Swiss-Prot record:
Keywords: Cytoplasm, Elongation factor, Protein biosynthesis
Matches recorded under InterPro entries: EF-Ts_dimer_sf, Transl_elong_EFTs/EF1B, Transl_elong_EFTs/EF1B_dimer, Transl_elong_Ts_CS, UBA-like_sf
Family affiliation: Belongs to the EF-Ts family.
Region (Involved in Mg(2+) ion dislocation from EF-Tu): 82-85
Localization in the cell: Cytoplasm
Lineage: Bacteria, Pseudomonadati, Pseudomonadota, Gammaproteobacteria, Oceanospirillales
Pfam families registered for this protein in UniProt: EF_TS
Role noted for this protein: Associates with the EF-Tu.GDP complex and induces the exchange of GDP to GTP. It remains bound to the aminoacyl-tRNA.EF-Tu.GTP complex up to the GTP hydrolysis stage on the ribosome.
An example molecular function term from Gene Ontology annotations: translation elongation factor activity
UniProt-recorded name of the protein: Elongation factor Ts
GO annotation, cellular component aspect: cytoplasm
SUPFAM superfamilies referenced in this protein's UniProt entry, alphabetically: Elongation factor Ts (EF-Ts), dimerisation domain, UBA-like
Species of the source: Chromohalobacter salexigens (strain ATCC BAA-138 / DSM 3043 / CIP 106854 / NCIMB 13768 / 1H11)
Predominant location: cytoplasm
Length: 289
């Protein structure tokens, strides 16, 4: 009998929307063949949930929670198929329940956290609202000694956690708001991946005004434009959104702090969405209600 790996169970869960134990059992009975397992599941009571899981869940919401003393914070993305469901009280309550578990466990291992009670709650929600619901990802961040974590959620769709060394909760939240609005690539210029810099350098060298320039002059121009690129895409160097006369680093420093880093979630980023027109979406909602 083939060994059933955790990754195989996870894949089956993602494709069917069913519980971990049910997926493991199905894989065991199918001798590790995931397609056979899906076929068997669709022949039994898992048919309805399995069909729902085939639909793309690229809408949803982001929720956060920060410890009262600001020492750590968590953020979670939960996906639904439509924005309409993402605003439903049942969906919101489920997301809050899951983020509470993430906060309590201080763990971003969504697969493990979704075992048992939370997975049962998810399956019940799927049956109740008629859409595929997926707990996509979570993150846990901790502040250094004397530091603070800040959080900001915009419209339920963009969430940010920031970490400061020193500073205070208000400043940390302000920086999180800036990240939500401006979406910097990295916290500090030195954090920019070399591959990203190489790509930008190639773009600069291909620009018309670089043609025919002596190597020394061209290199100076490249370095100048890379410096500008880093300033525009690094959180600490950007003009602070609430006061463009100072950089984010200057704003934080004035409060006795220093930017450590940030994490930004935006609902559905990286998920390929299906194109569905509005009329069709309304008809689907009416059919499920």
């Amino acid at each position: 009998m083939a060994a059933i790996s955790a990754s195989l169970v996870k894949e089956l869960r993602e494709r069917t929307g069913l519980g971990m134990m049910e997926c493991k059992k199905a894989l065991t009975e199918a001798d590790g063949d995931i397609e056979t397992a899906i076929e068997n599941l669709r022949k039994n009571s898992g048919l309805k949930a399995a069909k729902k899981a085939e639909r793309t869940a690229a809408e949803g919401g982001v929720v956060t929670r920060v410890a009262e003393d600001g020492t750590y914070g968590v953020m979670l993305e939960v996906n639904s198929e439509t924005d309409f469901v993402a605003r439903d009280d049942n969906f919101t309550a489920f997301a809050e329940k899951v983020v509470g578990k993430v906060f309590e466990a201080k763990s971003d291992d969504v697969a493990s956290l979704m075992e048992g009670e939370l997975e049962e709650a998810r399956e019940q929600l799927v049956q109740k609202i008629g859409e595929n619901i997926s707990v996509r990802r979570a993150v846990v961040v901790e502040a250094p000694a004397g530091g603070v974590v800040g959080a900001y959620v915009h419209g339920g769709r963009i969430g940010v956690l920031t970490v400061l060394k020193g500073g205070n909760a208000e400043v940390a939240k302000d920086v999180a708001m800036h990240v939500a609005a401006i979406n910097p690539s990295v916290a500090h210029p030195e954090d920019m991946p070399q591959a990203e810099l190489d790509s930008e350098k190639a773009i600069i060298l291909a620009q018309p005004d670089m043609a025919g320039k002596p190597a020394e002059i061209a290199e100076k121009m490249v370095q100048g434009r890379l410096k500008k690129y880093l300033a525009e895409n690094s959180l600490t160097e950007q003009p602070f959104v609430k006061d463009p006369n100072q950089s984010v680093a200057e704003y934080v420093k004035a409060a006795g702090g220093e930017v450590v880093g940030f994490t930004r979630f935006e609902v559905g980023e990286g998920i390929e969405k299906e194109e569905v027109d509005f009329a069709q979406e309304v008809m689907e909602q009416a059919r499920r209600s």
